[in-house]
Amino acid sequence: MSILSQFDPAVAEAIQHETERQEYNLELIASENFVSEAVLEAQGSVMTNKYAEGYPGKRYYGGCHHVDVVENLAIERAKELFGAEHANVQPHAGSQANMAVYNAVCQPGDTILGMNLSHGGHLTHGSPVNFSGRFYNVVPYGVSPDTETIDYNEVERLALEHKPKMIVVGASAYPRIIDFPAFRAIADKVGAKVMVDMAHIAGLVAAGVHPNPVPYAEFVTTTTHKTLRGPRGGMILCREEYAKTINSQIFPGIQGGPLMHVIAAKAVAFKEALQPEFKTYQQQIVKNAAKLAECLMAKGFKLTSGGTDNHLMLINFTGTEITGKAAEEALDKAGITVNKNTVPFETRSPFVTSGIRVGTPACTSHGLKETEMEQVAGFIADAVANIGNDEALAAIQKRVNELMKKFPLYASRLK
């Protein structure tokens, strides 16, 4: 019996049940992934005990020589991974990374261009319920009604009209390749800075299966989980000329002590991402997404933009009685985890939605490949066809569990 299970069996039991859920359910939330045992070990280490305000070699606390080693490793590996001049690995999350860049470039009331949340953007790209929408004058851009892909001509028109201080590029639910040179050219016409939030595609970028935004943007932010398959956290990449400003905007600007156990885990994840097998893994994520999209469309599902170029897709129920909320709940009962999601030109409430977001990073970490994607599409179709039929959904769950048992993830952690 573990120390935790002896002292706090309630927490230990919840952790065990979550381990079983991750092991036996089909995880299709596009922003989720499973870290390696090495990353778990680093994050669960004694590094969690150390305060280390400041930066390597310039701390406000003594005893930081060992945490300096891991932070420097994380920084240098991140720079190598993305070809960046400077990396700050201290942001606790992607939102803090984005906030630091806003603070470095903009004053309250300045104009920014950001992707409309319902068209695939992110809360921190100017949503009115977020700090980014409250502090700045936000001009949203979106996708074309015809292609459901980014309308670059409209972005240029808006930029020329509103003269933004910064253009925010990136998305949380956009299934297509983003044209970074096009955004750079638009920004240059109006003298704007470019911030690319590559949180969703960082792993794809690191492996060279999606274009790299670093050469085209003054600032690139990301989370370190999602496709990058590291611990939950954030990071900022920037040109050397902005290094001091960015560092000061993180500490002491918006954060105090960094989470050194998480930074240690980031360093490990970045080393993993530098290995040849990581490229193979990212290529498989994209292959799986393409196959799943193909199979879903063959079963009659409408996908926003007609498919995917990356790791995710949006199943669009517009024009049907099915809602994203109902589909999410039915799939959950079938052992398949997705999230309801707004779709472009959404007509329903964000608490109900007309779509679900589906992604392949986590199931690819389990080892599923194209053959299994055909089965996955069948599970999804069967579950959506049986909304409200709990008996049928329970039967699908058994089939899902049987499939996932063939692809163990954390076998040593199961009882």
UniProtKB/Swiss-Prot annotation:
Matches recorded under InterPro entries: PyrdxlP-dep_Trfase, PyrdxlP-dep_Trfase_major, PyrdxlP-dep_Trfase_small, Ser_HO-MeTrfase, Ser_HO-MeTrfase-like, Ser_HO-MeTrfase_PLP_BS, SHMT-like_dom
Transferase recorded as keyword: yes
Pathway: One-carbon metabolism; tetrahydrofolate interconversion; Amino-acid biosynthesis; glycine biosynthesis; glycine from L-serine: step 1/1
Gene Ontology CC: cytosol
Keyword terms: Amino-acid biosynthesis, Cytoplasm, One-carbon metabolism, Pyridoxal phosphate, Transferase
Positions where N6-(pyridoxal phosphate)lysine occurs in the chain: 226
Coiled-coil annotated spans: none
SUPFAM superfamilies: PLP-dependent transferases
Residues the record lists as binding (6S)-5,6,7,8-tetrahydrofolate: 117, 121-123, 241, 349-351
GO molecular function: glycine hydroxymethyltransferase activity; pyridoxal phosphate binding
Catalysis: reaction(s): (6R)-5,10-methylene-5,6,7,8-tetrahydrofolate + glycine + H2O = (6S)-5,6,7,8-tetrahydrofolate + L-serine
Family: Belongs to the SHMT family.
NCBIfam families, alphabetized: PRK00011.1 (NF000586)
Chain's role: Catalyzes the reversible interconversion of serine and glycine with tetrahydrofolate (THF) serving as the one-carbon carrier. This reaction serves as the major source of one-carbon groups required for the biosynthesis of purines, thymidylate, methionine, and other important biomolecules. Also exhibits THF-independent aldolase activity toward beta-hydroxyamino acids, producing glycine and aldehydes, via a retro-aldol mechanism.
Subunit: Homodimer.
Record-given protein name: Serine hydroxymethyltransferase
Taxonomic placement: Bacteria, Pseudomonadati, Thermodesulfobacteriota, Desulfuromonadia, Geobacterales
Gene name per UniProt: glyA
